[in-house]
């Protein structure tokens, strides 16, 4: 027998339309105030977790009721996930936090087969969902006395900077010829791959977020949760193996030149990071404003290479999804994916992830071209580091090392 626990998050049962508001994502024009109602089904006698494996929320969008179904992203963290920061005297401190009961979810809207959702439920609902072909953002409103949330379309966020933003990769590498049509590629479970990544946050990010490591972590977790949704189309699982925060100073010279920073980061990874944390790919997240319109750069077709399986990404927007898409873009270059051209498509009217320019349009998915190029790169090169399937965090019955602290010079097995 199933007992249904109905939790009314707010007594208000009606939405409210607003014209302008300042939210975490920036100034938003034309938003809707909603009061989600949580409906959770628990088996009789089951222990209530802080964050259930599956949850449902009911609210209204444009006056129509919707049911948001969420399932915990259990593959988000590796079983030996670690976090690293540095003490004022330069000691490296490594922790292995318990991440089994995290608050990051993927999901869909009930009765909308084409819907998707990527949501943080840590403090209210924050993230995005696609409903009837439209991308909506949702986040709690800054009112301590209420559980009100704002729902709005991405296009209603006032742009921070109208200047075009671009990936620094140029189209000067060899393509895999001939390019097949998507229908000619055979898809089976043998094509599933698993990319364990480490995110390195530089000191400019620490300054940008006023030294608030919890805020930095939440920002990164939300990004990774978003890109796991995007990469499922390419049959690639993205798993976060580690998060390193350069809390006191940068360990490389982070320059406004994206090219120089990428080179330095790759060299540092090969001589340092790769020996401390098991991972396949590393990305540097920086608040440094790269020269010109560049907001990201990565080596192409370089997966598993110690120096070149890396990218650098500028934290260029207050909209988490936009930075996450930039991260997904640079990682795809490592997987042999090129910039989209005019014939590439990810749905009518949509801008695709591998567009060389980020503009005001909603960026949705990888294109058909990206799918083909990724599959052909994997088929031809078969990068070995992404073949092994890591254990998920929910398979670990006890913590590996609890919250063990390690100083510089001590290794973790």
Swiss-Prot record:
Binds 1 zinc ion per subunit. Residues 1-20 form the signal peptide. SUPFAM superfamilies: Metalloproteases ('zincins'), catalytic domain (SSF55486). Zn(2+) binds at residues 329, 333, 339. One of its GO terms (molecular function) is zinc ion binding. Keywords: Calcium, Disulfide bond, Hemorrhagic toxin, Hemostasis impairing toxin, Hydrolase, Metal-binding, Metalloprotease, Protease, Secreted, Signal, Toxin, Zinc, Zymogen. Its cofactor is Zn(2+). InterPro entries: MetalloPept_cat_dom_sf (IPR024079), Peptidase_M12B (IPR001590), Peptidase_M12B_N (IPR002870), Reprolysin_adamalysin (IPR034027). Disulfide bonds join 304-385, 344-369, 346-352. GO terms for cellular component: extracellular region; plasma membrane. Its EC number is 3.4.24.-. The active site is at 330. PANTHER family: ADAM A DISINTEGRIN AND METALLOPROTEASE DOMAIN, DISINTEGRIN AND METALLOPROTEINASE DOMAIN-CONTAINING PROTEIN 28. This is Snake venom metalloproteinase acutolysin-A. It comes from Deinagkistrodon acutus.
């Amino acid at each position: 027998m199933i007992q249904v626990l109905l939790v009314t998050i707010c007594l208000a049962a009606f939405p409210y339309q607003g014209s302008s508001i300042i939210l975490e994502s920036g100034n938003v024009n034309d938003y809707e105030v909603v009061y989600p109602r949580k409906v959770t089904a628990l088996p009789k006698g089951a222990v209530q977790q802080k964050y259930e494996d599956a949850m449902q929320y009911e609210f209204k969008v444009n006056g129509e009721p919707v049911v948001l179904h969420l399932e915990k992203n259990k593959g988000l963290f590796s079983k030996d996930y670690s976090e690293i920061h540095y003490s004022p005297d330069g000691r490296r401190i490594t922790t292995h936090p318990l991440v089994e009961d995290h608050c990051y979810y993927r999901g869909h809207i009930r009765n909308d087969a084409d819907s998707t959702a990527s949501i943080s439920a840590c403090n209210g609902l924050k993230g995005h969902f696609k409903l009837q072909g439209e991308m909506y953002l949702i986040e709690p409103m800054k009112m301590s006395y209420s559980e009100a949330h704002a729902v709005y379309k991405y296009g209603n966020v006032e742009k921070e900077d109208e200047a075009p933003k671009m990936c620094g990769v140029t189209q000067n590498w060899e393509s895999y010829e001939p390019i097949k049509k998507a229908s000619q590629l055979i898809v089976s479970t043998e094509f599933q791959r698993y990319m364990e990544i480490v995110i390195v946050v530089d000191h400019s990010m620490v300054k940008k977020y006023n030294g608030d490591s919890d805020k930095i972590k939440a920002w990164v977790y939300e990004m990774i949760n978003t890109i796991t949704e995007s990469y499922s189309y390419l049959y690639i699982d993205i798993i976060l193996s580690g998060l390193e925060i350069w809390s006191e100073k940068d360990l490389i010279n982070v320059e406004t030149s994206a090219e120089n920073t990428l080179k330095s980061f790759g060299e540092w990874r090969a001589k340092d990071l790769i020996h401390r944390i098991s991972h396949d790919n590393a990305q540097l997240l920086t608040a440094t404003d790269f020269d010109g319109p560049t907001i990201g750069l990565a080596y192409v077709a370089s997966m598993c290479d110690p120096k070149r399986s890396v990218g650098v990404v500028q934290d260029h927007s207050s909209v988490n999804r936009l930075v996450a898409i930039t991260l997904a873009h640079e990682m795809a270059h490592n997987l042999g994916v090129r910039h989209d051209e005019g014939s590439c498509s990810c749905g009518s009217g949509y801008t695709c992830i591998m567009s060389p320019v980020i503009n005001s349009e909603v960026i949705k998915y990888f294109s058909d071209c990206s799918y083909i190029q990724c599959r052909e790169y994997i088929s031809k090169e078969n990068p070995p580091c992404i073949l092994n399937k890591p254990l998920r965090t929910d398979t670990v019955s006890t913590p590996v090392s609890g919250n063990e602290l390690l100083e510089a010079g001590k290794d973790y097995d």
